[in-house]
Amino acid sequence: MLYGKENRDEAEFLEPIFGSESEQVDLPKYKLAQQSIEPRVAYQLVQDEMLDEGNARLNLATFCQTYMEPEAVKLMSQTLEKNAIDKSEYPRTTEIENRCVNMIADLWNASEKEKFMGTSTIGSSEACMLGGMAMKFSWRKRAEKLGLDINAKKPNLVISSGYQVCWEKFCIYWDIEMREVPMDKEHMSINLDKVMDYVDEYTIGVVGIMGITYTGRYDDIKALDNLIEEYNKQTDYKVYIHVDAASGGLYAPFVEPELEWDFRLKNVISINTSGHKYGLVYPGVGWVLWRDKKYLPEELIFKVSYLGGELPTMAINFSHSASQLIGQYYNFVRYGFDGYKAIHERTHKVAMFLAKEIEKTGMFEIMNDGSQLPIVCYKLKEDSNRGWNLYDLADRLLMKGWQVPAYPLPKNLENEIIQRLVIRADFGMNMAFNYVQDMQEAIEALNKAHILYHEEPENKTYGFTH
């Protein structure tokens, strides 16, 4: 969010710290205070400002990790001050990043015959930007070599309308036409019957999504790869796939290792993921890998002289703390393959349980039951004849602390209002039982309430987060 003068409150107030007049201070809001205050007082003031915020553990809107072990937190707190970009000053941190890239490449079945490359980012949004830039630059080289007039029209990117907002940003920032393949009731992921209709010689690439933000569904990347392969056989203007696996990239390899969506597929040339989602690290850390260095244009790799050393870097951001990299490596060391598998399978069971319990109420149609990503989505049945809607239900659940988003589906399905539960590693079966009980009580209260009917349905977004 961007902030400006209109975001300011009208007044500032004197705040006593637990009734002590001697520690009564002016809480600064929009201008620095003239004088310093004691650290204990500053701590209490800032802590009090956050008293009425939601409990992150009860936030079922976010994909982001909301719990890490104390040992991980300790390691991360010990490395907060380290700038991960200072490769020469912190060589062990650099090696840890390299190990993480190699471990992820192995999970994604990178071939020993190819020379994969990858880097950390501060999240999947940056990783998507880098993957998109590589596709654009590579397309431009191929197009110029084939004699295509690259200035005749905008290059384009093909993606499902269930895309994450970072792709819209990418297309705006780098002047790319976004070609959205519409979702519909029969196609809640990329429509394989229509996707190739959007591809032409100006297409820089096709994005497949492993975990659509709205519903948690996977695009069928293997089927998409087959379509791209057939297309490439018929033209000199080759097209390749970038997989946005922000959510699924560190989930699917453990829960569905036989599912082919990664570098096992010939035309998948790059993949991104979020370490702070199902990689189980606090925000924010992301990863992007290319199957071979030939898919990463040299002009996007910078060699920077910095504090006595020369380093190759490919990032939009520069300075960032090493702590999230350390947290990711801790998790890889701590859990190993079997540990991640056990955690994610448990999360999967919780999601499936919730879907069944919600369906038992008889009022909801399950849009996604958590059988892929542990995301449960549902809408009110069309014949429910209730005086309340999902926004009302979200309000009632919030009274118990549960933050549950209600929102319309993307273009072409915007009249479908759904709720989404993102089940994370720290959401166990006991919490699931509590949620079901609170949901049942909320429904009972709404059924008994004298509700002022909504004159017009408002397809707003309530508590939705990517």
UniProtKB/Swiss-Prot annotation:
Keywords: Decarboxylase, Lyase, Pyridoxal phosphate. Optimum pH is 4.7. Active at acidic pHs but inactive in the neutral pH range. Its cofactor is pyridoxal 5'-phosphate. Active up to 70 degrees Celsius at pH 4.1. It holds the Pfam family Pyridoxal_deC. SUPFAM superfamilies: PLP-dependent transferases. The keyword ATP-binding does not apply. Gene3D superfamilies: 3.90.1150.160, 4.10.280.50, Type I PLP-dependent aspartate aminotransferase-like (Major domain) (3.40.640.10). It catalyses: L-glutamate + H(+) = 4-aminobutanoate + CO2. InterPro entries: Glutamate_decarboxylase, PyrdxlP-dep_de-COase, PyrdxlP-dep_Trfase, PyrdxlP-dep_Trfase_major. CDD domains: DOPA_deC_like. The modification N6-(pyridoxal phosphate)lysine is found at residue 277. GO terms for molecular function: aromatic-L-amino-acid decarboxylase activity; glutamate decarboxylase activity; pyridoxal phosphate binding. Its EC number is 4.1.1.15. One of its GO terms (cellular component) is cytosol. GO terms for biological process: glutamate catabolic process. Belongs to the group II decarboxylase family. Converts internalized glutamate to GABA and increases the internal pH. Involved in glutamate-dependent acid resistance. PANTHER family: GLUTAMATE DECARBOXYLASE. This is Glutamate decarboxylase. It comes from Lactococcus lactis subsp. lactis (strain IL1403).
